[in-house]
Amino acid sequence: MKTALFSFLFSALLLLGCNGETPIQPDIPDELDETEILIYEEIQIPTKPAGTPTFTATETIDGSKGGYVKIKESYITEDDDTVLIDVKLKIKKDCFSGNADITMTMDDIYTAVSFSPDMVFENPVELDVKYKGLDPDQLNFPSGEYEFLYIDDDGNTETVPSYGVNVNAELGEISVKKAKLSHFSRYAFGR
């Protein structure tokens, strides 16, 4: 009895489903939803006194061995506050082929860092960035509203995978650990 009922239902499904008409197409709206564009504001560092150099470091890295590029600097603001900047780029072995002179440059206005030459990596490199002594007003947002971002030449942004952005507004501190960079460009904290 079950077999007969199953055969009848299956035959009915085939007859109703295969009637020679054009297949059903999903509804496609005339206007596509606009993609939400997130706009981030970069976080400013306190003004450097005149004559303070741009912080930069260059290291020759053998891609088969890997290596580090580090910047650990500080400066005194016009208000006699100290700003500390501690940045470390870790390049694991075999992220790229050959040797390269890799330059890391800290921005003079924002909590941002740029790299050269232009490179794309077979495996991501890791970046740790920490600023301390920033204006607390620049950090007056809940911690979850901060991101570490890749910023292209047109100002478009993309969140960089990391262990997260940590903020301590009282100390004027913001940091990111193990940000995964797949290529060199400009990266910054944004809110």
Where are the regions that the model predicts?
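Bacterial Sec-dependent N-terminal signal peptides
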Residues: 14-48, 191
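C-terminal beta-strand-rich structural cap/linker in extracellular carbohydrate-active enzymes
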Residues: 175-191
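Proteolytic processing hotspots in large secreted/extracellular or virion-associated proteins
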Residues: 32-65, 95-154
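Sec-dependent bacterial lipoprotein signal peptides
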Residues: 1-16
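Solvent-exposed serine/threonine-rich low-complexity stretches and specific carbohydrate-binding patches
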Residues: 159-169
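Surface-exposed coil/turn segments at beta-strand junctions on protein surfaces, enriched
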Residues: 64, 120-122, 169-172, 180-182
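Aromatic sugar-binding surface patches on proteins
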Residues: 127, 172-173
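Predominantly extracellular/luminal regions of secreted and cell-surface proteins
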Residues: 59-100
